[in-house]
Regions:
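Glycine-rich beta-alpha junction loops
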Residues: 1, 27-29, 61, 97-100, ...
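Short, charged, surface-exposed loops that flank catalytic or proteolytic processing sites
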Residues: 70-77, 144-154
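Glycine/small-residue-rich loop that forms an oxyanion/phosphate-binding "nest" at active or ligand-binding sites
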Residues: 1-47, 57
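Short, small-residue alpha-helix embedded
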Residues: 64, 125-149
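Short pre-catalytic strand/loop immediately N-terminal to key active-site residues, enriched for Gly-Thr
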Residues: 115-129
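Conserved phosphate/ATP/ADP-binding segment of small-molecule kinases
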Residues: 38-115
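Structural signal for hydrophobic packing residues in well-ordered secondary-structure cores
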Residues: 13, 17, 52, 88, ...
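Charged C-terminal helix
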Residues: 150-195
Length: 195
């Protein structure tokens, strides 16, 4: 079953001896608000969160992992981040995206000591397929290149903001983010504030 695969992923990480483990807890299809497989949530909590260096849920996923349900504010995000941190992940970044504000993109990072709000301008949203996966991959890459978890998360936010801003239309239904935009077109500034 899928829970067995989740458990095996956690085991493989430990067996690998890798320094960092970034978990992107994909639970829903884009545009949906129902968990694909509810048993997977508990498996992620049990087998992945205690082993992860960084976990990168969106608002819906953070609500599921924390058990708090729908998150609608920075305060809700802080509560969820604390609960997820308490489950064993030392670095929690909750991606708020456009859900809290139509003009700004707010994410919340928690390292067990301080909450940080990461803010960028909101860019076009029509062509943003792959943004969440790209964020987790960019965080992983920045960690592998020697950045601290906080530095990696901030750099990944900038990378993805540029990728979203420069996303492109693939067809009438979807368009991906532009993974090369940060290096080729522009680097987006991320405002970091303690909250």
């Amino acid at each position: 079953g899928t829970q067995d695969i989740i458990k095996r992923a956690g085991d493989v990480f430990v067996e690998s001896g890798a320094d960092y483990f970034v978990v992107d807890p994909v639970m829903v299809c884009k545009g949906e608000d129902e968990v694909l497989n509810p048993g997977n949530t508990e498996a992620m909590i049990q087998y992945l969160l205690p082993k992860a260096t960084v976990v990168t849920p969106n608002l819906f996923e953070a609500g599921q992992l924390s058990g708090l349900g729908k998150l609608t504010s920075i305060e809700d995000m802080k509560k969820a981040a604390q609960v997820i941190y308490d489950k064993g992940t030392p670095h929690v970044i909750i991606k708020g995206g456009k859900a809290l504000d139509q003009d700004k993109s707010y994410d919340l990072y928690y390292d067990g000591q301080q909450f940080y709000q990461l803010t960028t301008d909101m860019f076009q949203q029509s062509y943003n397929h792959g943004a969440g996966c790209t964020f987790a991959a960019a965080t992983t890459a920045y960690l592998a290149n020697g950045k601290s978890p906080k530095e990696a998360i901030i750099a990944a936010k900038a990378f993805v903001a540029s990728a979203i801003k420069n996303g492109w239309k693939m067809n009438d239904f979807v368009g991906p983010v532009d993974h090369g935009a940060y290096n080729r077109i522009e680097q987006i500034n991320v405002e970091v504030t303690e909250v």
